[in-house]
From Swiss-Prot:
Keywords: Coiled coil, Metal-binding, Methylation, Nucleus, Repeat, RNA-binding, Zinc, Zinc-finger. Residues 314-330 have a biased composition (Polar residues). A zinc finger (C3H1-type) spans 36-63, 73-99, 134-161. GO terms for cellular component: nucleus. Specific regulator of miRNA biogenesis. Binds, via the C3H1-type zinc finger domains, to the binding motif 5'-GCAGCGC-3' on microRNA pri-MIR143 and negatively regulates the processing to mature microRNA. This is Zinc finger CCCH domain-containing protein 10. The gene is ZC3H10.
Length: 434
């Protein structure tokens, strides 16, 4: 511990100070970094309470060395947690200063003025009561708390608190005090370093003072008193700062949750848009087969009519090639009588072979009929011009056939029904005598 007050070294419990009633482990915990060393001095021996004797692992100095104890003990320790991030100890025993303040203290051995005032306020002393260097004897904190039982044997300085003299109306110093009293202090500032030891029962309100000059001389007199309010407590400020820090952390967590929820919402919106597009594609694909089924009967009807036309041409060709006398009345069909196409017409069969004596004359006719049938079976739209077939009489047989066929135009894209006229057929056959 830098001084006997356990104020500066900040290690160990409340019993590590002079007269704190520390245990065997607490007596040496403040020296160094927590381990025993050859230069560690037993604090219990300095207070005349060490009962370990030769078994003590700390050094028991001679009385001549007591005057130089301040060289190694009268030091202030800075709080490194406060310098790094934040100190969470409400009753921190170390000095809350910056790294530059600590470096300046190690070089010069003196605290900056603002830190001296802060440390003195924590101890209930004036800044002048603090030791100015490492050569001075440390202050006895047990005496400041009223617990020092050593009396005149105590090797540390006994300083009186300022509020004791202020309550008595005296402004001087006493009891070994080497400084002046700060004006305007009515009561002791709350010692944040002694919170577990003192509690809240030791505080006494300041004296009341009658306020004069507020009432007229002839009127009723009312006595009013002015109460002095205590300055803000260090502990309360620390609690408020901790609460603010917790609230800030909570706000940061809520902000993170909001950002996560926004990202999840964007992903869900994208998935919803994808599902809507998939539904549209499924609807279009289900409509396409229905259109194909609607167009199928039309194609079948056209094919049926093509077969009917082919059958008509085949019938005409077979009738024209029969060598029998036929009158013109039998060959003329009623005008405007439509020929009903067969529903399930079989593909046209090949025409029967002509007689041997008509083969040279019938060959051009068969080729023309085959070409006409091929044109009738072509895919729609189909347009057929009137076909006129004439057979010149080479032999004694003369065959003349004219078959005017009206133009037929079929389109399955406009209407499923196909209407076509069939004109009258005329055929003149002259039979030659043998």
């Amino acid at each position: 511990m830098p001084d006997r007050d356990s104020y500066a070294n900040g290690t160990g419990s409340s019993g590590g100070g002079p007269g704190g009633g520390g245990s065997e482990e607490a007596s040496g915990a403040g020296v160094g970094s927590g381990g025993a060393s050859s230069d560690a001095i037993c604090r219990d021996f300095l207070r005349n309470v060490c009962k370990r004797g030769k078994r003590c692992r700390y050094r028991h100095p001679d009385m001549s060395e007591v005057s130089n104890l301040g060289v190694s003990k009268n030091e202030f320790i800075f709080c490194h947690d406060f310098q790094n991030k934040e100190c969470s100890r409400p009753n921190c025993r170390f000095i809350h200063g910056s790294k530059e303040d600590e470096d300046g203290y190690k070089k010069t051995g003196e605290l900056p003025p603002r830190l001296r005032q802060k440390v003195a306020a924590g101890l209930g002393l004036s800044p002048a009561d603090l030791p100015n260097g490492k050569e001075e004897v440390p202050i006895c904190r047990d005496f400041l708390k009223g617990d020092c039982q050593r009396g005149a044997k105590c090797k540390f300085r006994h300083l009186q608190r300022d509020f004791e003299f202020d309550a008595r109306g005296g402004g001087g110093t006493g009891g070994g005090s080497t400084g002046s009293v700060l004006p305007g202090r009515r009561h002791d500032l709350y010692d944040i370093y002694d919170l577990p030891d003192r509690g809240f029962e030791d505080h006494e309100p300041g004296p009341k003072r009658r306020r004069g000059g507020c009432c007229p001389p002839d009127g009723p007199h009312f006595e009013s008193y002015e109460y002095s309010l205590a300055p803000p407590r260090g502990v309360e400020c620390r609690l408020l700062e901790e609460e603010n820090a917790m609230l800030r952390k909570r706000v940061e967590e809520l902000k993170k949750q909001v950002s996560n929820l926004l990202a999840t919402n964007e992903v869900l919106l994208e998935q919803n848009a994808q599902f809507r597009n998939q539904a549209k594609v499924i609807t279009l694909s289900s409509t396409a087969p229905a259109t194909e089924q609607t167009l199928a009967p039309t194609v079948g009807t056209v094919a049926t009519f093509n077969h009917g036309i082919a059958q008509t041409h085949t019938t005409l060709s077979s009738q024209a090639l029969q060598p029998r006398p036929v009158s013109q009345q039998e060959l003329v069909a009623p005008a405007g009588a439509p020929a009903a196409p067969p529903t399930n017409a079989a593909p046209p069969a090949a025409p029967p072979p002509p007689p041997p004596h008509l083969t040279p004359e019938i060959t051009p006719l068969s080729a023309a009929l085959a070409q006409t049938i091929a044109q009738g079976m072509a895919p729609p739209p189909v347009s057929m011009a009137p076909v006129a077939v004439s057979v010149a009489p080479v032999a004694p047989v003369a065959v003349s056939m004219a078959q005017p066929l009206a133009g037929i135009t079929m389109s399955h894209t406009t209407t499923p029904m196909v209407t076509y006229p069939i004109a009258s057929q005329s055929m003149r056959i002259t039979a030659m005598p043998h």
